[in-house]
């Protein structure tokens, strides 16, 4: 299974955790010219991929949209959105995208749904025209996308090997990110009448 039939892209926002990027890029099995790295701090470009710098205040949803918008501009079918601290095994991005295509799904992810989608890895059908709501700054935007996707079609779990190395570590150790998370939760609940 390769990305030769479907036009599958990948975007990764990254700050200071660049040590995993080379392995993610290699193991994604996505052509480097279809990879968008969104740098959130001053940093050197990653050779061979599309590099974008977004040094404005923290907003992971804006960072996701930067990659989504590039892929959409080039006519992509699907885009995978990954954190910069994942380990990929056995071609998970293509596996999810091809599974979504077969099931006519709008959104796919690699783990069973447990109240939240795994924000560290999800794949979006670009033709859905869904973008992340940039009112969210740090959390809940992935669940917002899930609810938007459910309004348009199927949201599916496709078993795939994606390991998240530092789950919620940044948030739990950063008071500012915790405040953003609380504000995002309040907005999410209000937006979806929860």
Regions found by a protein language model. Name each.
Residues 137-139, 143-194:
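C-terminal catalytic/acceptor-binding lobe
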Residues 86-116:
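Conserved donor NDP-sugar-binding/catalytic core segment of glycosyltransferases
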Residues 108-124, 131, 137-138, 176:
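A recurrent flexible, glycine/aromatic-enriched loop bordering the glycosyltransferase active site
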Residues 26-55:
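Acidic donor-binding segment of Leloir-type glycosyltransferases
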Residues 7-9, 144:
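Cell-envelope/extracellular polymer assembly enzymes that use nucleotide-activated donors
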Residues 55-71:
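Glycine-rich, basic loop-to-helix element that forms the pyrophosphate-binding segment
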Residues 76-87:
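Short beta-strand-to-loop acidic/aromatic patch adjacent to the donor-nucleotide binding site
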Residues 16-30:
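Short, well-formed alpha-helical segments that are part of the catalytic scaffolds
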């Amino acid at each position: 299974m390769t990305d030769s039939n479907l036009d599958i892209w990948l975007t990764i926002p990254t700050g200071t955790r660049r040590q995993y990027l080379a392995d993610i890029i290699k193991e994604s099995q996505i052509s480097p010219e279809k990879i968008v790295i969104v740098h959130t701090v001053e940093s050197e470009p990653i050779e061979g991929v599309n590099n974008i710098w977004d040094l404005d205040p923290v907003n992971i949803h804006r960072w996701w949209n930067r990659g989504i918008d590039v892929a959409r501009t080039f006519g992509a079918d699907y885009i995978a959105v990954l954190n910069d601290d994942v380990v990929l095994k056995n071609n998970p991005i293509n596996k999810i995208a091809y599974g979504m295509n077969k099931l006519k799904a709008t959104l796919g992810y690699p783990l069973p749904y447990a109240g939240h989608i795994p924000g560290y890895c999800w794949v979006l059908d670009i033709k859905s025209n869904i973008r992340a709501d940039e009112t969210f700054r740090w959390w809940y935007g992935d669940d917002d996308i899930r609810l938007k996707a459910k309004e348009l079609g199927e949201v599916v779990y496709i078993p795939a090997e994606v390991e998240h190395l530092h789950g919620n570590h940044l948030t739990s150790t950063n008071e500012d990110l915790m405040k953003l998370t609380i504000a995002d939760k309040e907005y999410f609940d209000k937006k979806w009448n929860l």
